[in-house]
């Protein structure tokens, strides 16, 4: 079992960090929303019902 990497709106963030929107197949989207959440905070609604949240990649 591994750590979950994609999250739906309303789920709780597992860790502190920046999260970005992605398409439901894992594809990148134009102008994605970015949010900074602390562990335990709820993910906000996405701008499209087919999108999910994932960790922002480190540079």
Curated annotation (Swiss-Prot):
One Pfam family linked to the record: YjzC
Domain of life: Bacteria
InterPro entries reported in the protein's UniProt record: YjzC
Protein name (Swiss-Prot/TrEMBL): Uncharacterized protein YjzC
Phylogenetic lineage: Bacteria, Bacillati, Bacillota, Bacilli, Bacillales
């Amino acid at each position: 079992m591994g750590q979950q990497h994609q999250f739906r709106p309303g789920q709780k963030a597992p860790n502190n960090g920046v999260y970005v929107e992605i398409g439901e197949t894992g594809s990148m989207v134009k102008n994605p929303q970015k949010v900074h959440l602390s562990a335990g905070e709820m993910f906000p609604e996405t701008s499209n019902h087919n999108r999910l949240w994932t960790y922002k990649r480190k540079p």
